[in-house]
Amino acid sequence: MASFTTTSSSSLLLKTLLPVSHLNRFSTLSGIRVGDSWTPLLRNISTAGSRRRVAIVKAATVDSDYSSKRSNSNEQRETIMLPGCDYNHWLIVMEFPKDPAPSRDQMIDTYLNTLATVLGSMEEAKKNMYAFSTTTYTGFQCTIDEETSEKFKGLPGVLWVLPDSYIDVKNKDYGGDKYINGEIIPCTYPTYQPKQRNNTKYQSKRYERKRDGPPPPEQRKPRQEPAASDSS
């Protein structure tokens, strides 16, 4: 398990933000703010595990006013332990054009080609990519060392290079759709299902909607005259 020291330096901020999984545990990191001053990169989504990953992938730098105040102070830095961070599992966040937006297959091909550029072959890329996403976030996860991770910087479409960490600590799961030697296994995070309303007690109160307009005229039966008696 790795330890990470927060800092106001924008070059170290991306590595300090890290994996995208523990914002629910740390609402604020020393020197890092999550609030209106951030420019959101990704949208929130419904699954709990992915929400944690998306939440911390927020922005590249803090606002300059806050950073300058931080750099001029002697505030002590905080060290945060993140389960799963070992500098051998990395999250590569990428961006894609919106118009026209690429298909899922095209995004996966881009992930593999980007990793192949770093590792030297498509075969190695397929061996080392272990997960990815094209929906809740746009990026892939791969097993490489820290020195190799530096080679992603400056490649087309690459936004951030972040050490990965568990989104499910109990099951040691890094999240995303699994990618095992070319085989894709979609993630199966539980989603919230609202309880269905019990309408049994309302069934007796159902009624039919009346037609618009005035009520139809009342129809009366003709009055029957009493039968005349025969005269004797």
From Swiss-Prot:
Q: Which InterPro entries match?
A: MORF/ORRM1/DAG-like, MORF/ORRM1/DAG-like_MORF, S8pro/Inhibitor_I9_sf
Q: What happens when the gene is disrupted?
A: White leaves with green islands, giving a variegated appearance. Mutant plants can grow autotrophically on soil.
User: Which domain of life does this protein belong to?
Assistant: Eukaryota
Can you provide one Gene Ontology molecular function annotated for this UniProt record?
Answer: protein dimerization activity
Q: Where is the composition biased (Polar residues)?
A: 190-202
- GO cellular component annotations of the record: chloroplast; chloroplast envelope; chloroplast stroma
Region entry Disordered, spans:
190-232
Would the keyword Phosphoprotein be found if you checked this record's keyword annotation? Answer: no
| Transit peptide interval | 1-58
Q: Which keywords does this Swiss-Prot/TrEMBL entry list?
A: Chloroplast, mRNA processing, Plastid, Transit peptide
Tell me the compartments it is located in. Plastid, Chloroplast
The protein's matches in Pfam families, at most eight in alphabetical order, are given as:
MORF_dom
Question: Which GO BP terms apply?
Answer: chloroplast RNA modification; cytidine to uridine editing; mRNA processing
Give the compositionally biased regions (Basic and acidic residues).
205-224
Assembly and oligomerization: Homodimer and heterodimer with MORF2. Interacts with protoporphyrinogen oxidase 1 PPOX1. Heterodimer with MORF5/RIP5. Interacts with PCMP-A2/PMD1. Interacts with ORRM6.
Q: Give the family from UniProt.
A: Belongs to the MORF family.
> What is this protein's function per UniProt?
Involved in organellar RNA editing. Required for the processing of multiple editing sites in plastids.
What is the name listed in the Swiss-Prot or TrEMBL entry for this protein? Multiple organellar RNA editing factor 9, chloroplastic
Q: Which organism is it from?
A: Arabidopsis thaliana
